[in-house]
A protein has these predicted regions:
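Short, aromatic-rich membrane-interface segments at the entry and exit
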Residues: 3-6, 30, 55-62
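N-terminal signal-anchor transmembrane helix
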Residues: 52, 58-110, 126-130
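Hydrophobic alpha-helical transmembrane segments
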Residues: 46-54
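Soluble catalytic domains of enzymes that build or remodel membrane lipids, polysaccharides, and related
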Residues: 84, 94-108, 116-332
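N-terminal signal-anchor/start-transfer transmembrane helix
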Residues: 8-25
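Short acidic/polar active-site loop segments enriched in Thr and Asp
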Residues: 113
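Loop-to-helix transition at the N-terminal end of transmembrane alpha-helices
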Residues: 29-45
Length: 332
């Protein structure tokens, strides 16, 4: 019975992993991509338990368990050249959450140059602008009451800012240029695409199309770029990995930790949904998840440093012909 239970658990974990690999956009299949850490922990436990029995099923169970395990990065910044570094904070506030002071206190403590808040309505916009408007005078305000509002606050000069609705009229995104203290220009994209879920969308098409459309633009721009936001997707999903190859962007978390930002209320069910992606022109100063403040997301804080001379140290992902075909099919 013990051996059968181990084998059944192994097969269940393998099934969820296989479902996540199926190239369809149904929400329940895409949901299978999220719990990789939980699956990995259960797989490791199953593998360990399988070693205590001499039953021939052990080898099959162990193989199935280990087949769902896997890993990988952006170079660390060196001291100096602070005028080329951008400390930034990203936070999904959860619209009905009214603990604005919990977030504002953390912003004032860490003093990031860029603050992006998501799910912000008029109430949140007023609270944040009242507290941050003097210290972060460059503001892009897009309040909405549909969970897709966003506000951008900056101490650095911003240029050429546009609020776009790339795929759907009720889903905004922010695009423009950050002017570093050194005078150099960095392209910025801030996104919060609609997720695949029973309440939002039956498929992941809208999310995937928005992400890949911006990724294609980043690749064509070819200059230094940052992409930040709640992407409603995990770092290891097929779509996010396709995005990194198409855009050429790197994930600072790889090789450093999960930095899971959602769900703040469920310790065992957390995934990294809030992202900071960078092109090869950057190095990482520091990265950390901040404190819970009543939202279902934790804020995330990172310092990215513009060091184009170190671009060759980073392993920039590149798309193949199949990737390009996938992008064309998704966008069109």
């Amino acid at each position: 019975m013990f051996d059968l239970a181990i084998f059944a658990l192994s097969m269940m974990l393998l099934a969820v992993t296989v479902f996540a690999k199926i190239r369809l956009r149904d929400w329940w299949l895409r949901a299978c991509e999220f719990p990789r850490v939980q699956i990995a922990c259960l797989a490791a436990l199953t593998a360990a338990l399988a070693t205590v029995t001499d039953d021939p099923w052990r080898a099959y169970s162990l193989t199935a368990s280990l087949s769902v395990l896997a890993v990988q990065q952006l170079k660390a910044a060196e001291p100096g050249h602070e005028d080329r570094c951008v400390p930034l904070l990203v936070s999904n506030v959860l619209t009905p959450n009214r603990n604005s002071q919990g977030l504002i206190t953390q912003i004032l403590e860490h003093q990031p140059d860029i603050v992006l808040t998501l799910e912000t309505d008029d109430w949140w916009g007023e609270k944040l602008q009242s507290a941050l408007g003097e210290g972060w005078p460059e503001i892009v305000s897009v309040p909405q009451d549909n969970l897709y509002g966003m506000h951008l606050f900056s101490r650095l000069e911003l240029q050429g800012l546009e609020v776009k609705r790339l795929i759907q009229d009720d889903i905004p995104s922010i695009h423009g240029w950050i002017i570093l203290k050194s005078g150099e220009r960095i392209r910025l994209h801030a996104l919060h695409p609609r997720p695949p879920s029973p309440q939002e969308s039956d498929t992941s098409l809208w999310r995937d199309a928005e992400l890949l459309l911006v990724g294609k633009e980043i690749r064509e721009h070819a200059g230094p770029s940052l992409l930040i936001g709640d992407l409603n997707d995990v770092a290891w999903s097929r779509t996010t990995k396709l995005f990194t190859r198409v855009s050429g962007m790197l994930d600072p978390r790889r090789g450093r930790g999960m930095f899971s930002t959602f769900h703040a209320g469920h310790r065992l069910l957390r995934w990294p949904l809030d992202h900071i992606f960078v092109t090869e022109h950057f190095t990482l100063g520091q990265m950390q998840r901040l404190k819970e403040f009543g939202s279902d997301h934790f804020p995330i804080l990172a310092t990215l440093c513009y060091h184009p001379s170190r671009s060759d140290e980073n392993d920039t992902p590149r798309p193949d012909a199949e990737d390009k075909a996938d992008v064309k099919e998704t966008i069109h």
